[in-house]
């Protein structure tokens, strides 16, 4: 289980968020500037909260009370960035392997191979190409493959579909659901897209100006808050100034 209690003050916004999440895909939904990416960065160890507590399956990543701050490289977290963050001078295969310890590259103490990940994401035929030769969807699959190569205990995704065309977006939505089912680790995805939220979320946190407005759990959806089947003409679910 991911347990997060994060306080972080930034120019123009104060983030105060607390939540627990166990399985499936958690979507953090909110407008631009609401603090979504900062929350991911705090979980990943790329930014330190001002105070709070972050743990995963009992392993404490950050605790202001106990003066604990685990380095990002030791957290076993996969992170897919909004801009792909691929190295232009490296091939797809080398991008995927970047940062993997040398003993793992030789197959020692490592459960998954590069070809396994390439095949899983249907990009084996691209392994010797460079990022400039890839489409947006191919770049995103490469970024996903790199995040999975570290065998993460949780996967963070920052607006992973925002730059893709409709066809690639629909395809990757299905692939993300299948990846989560196969890997059986929590996914935390942030988006400002209502359609992505409907397509992907098992649980939803509505974020507004750095604060959690509502946490929608699976049992709430089963009880009648069926967000996935809402249409443009349906009553909207309003959360402090924006609707879904």
Question: Which role does the model predict for each range below?
Answer:
Residues 61-78, 102:
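ABC ATPase NBD coupling module
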Residues 155-159:
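Catalytic Walker B motif of ABC-type/P-loop ATPase nucleotide-binding domains
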Residues 90-99:
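Short coil-to-helix segment of the ABC ATPase nucleotide-binding domain corresponding to the Q-loop/switch region
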Residues 130-134, 138-140:
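Conserved ABC ATPase signature
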Residues 184-190:
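Conserved H-loop
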Residues 59-64, 108-126, 177-178:
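Conserved ABC ATPase "signature" region
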Residues 149-153:
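A short, proline-enriched helix->beta-strand linker immediately N-terminal to the Walker B motif
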């Amino acid at each position: 289980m991911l347990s997060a209690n994060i306080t972080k003050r930034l120019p123009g916004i104060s983030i105060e968020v607390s939540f627990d999440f166990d399985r499936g895909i958690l979507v953090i939904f909110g407008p631009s500037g609401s603090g979504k990416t900062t929350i991911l960065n705090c979980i990943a160890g790329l930014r330190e909260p001002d105070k709070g507590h972050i743990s995963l399956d009992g392993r404490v990543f950050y605790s202001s009370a106990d003066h604990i701050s685990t380095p990002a490289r030791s957290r076993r977290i996969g992170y897919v960035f909004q801009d792909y963050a691929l190295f232009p001078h490296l091939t797809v295969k080398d991008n995927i392997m970047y940062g993997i310890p040398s003993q793992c590259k030789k197959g020692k103490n490592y459960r998954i191979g590069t070809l396994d990940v390439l095949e899983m994401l249907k990009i084996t035929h691209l392994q010797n190409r460079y990022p400039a030769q890839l489409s947006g969807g191919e770049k995103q699959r490469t970024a996903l493959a790199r995040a999975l190569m570290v065998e993460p205990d949780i996967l963070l995704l920052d607006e992973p579909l925002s730059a893709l065309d409709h066809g690639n977006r629909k395809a990757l939505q299905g692939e993300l659901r299948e990846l989560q089912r196969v890997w059986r680790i929590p996914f935390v995805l942030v988006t400002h897209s209502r359609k992505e939220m409907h397509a992907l979320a098992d649980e939803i946190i509505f974020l507004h100006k750095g604060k959690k407005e509502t946490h929608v759990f699976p049992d709430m959806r089963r009880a009648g808050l069926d967000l996935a089947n809402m249409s443009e003409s349906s009553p909207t679910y309003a959360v402090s100034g924006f609707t879904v």
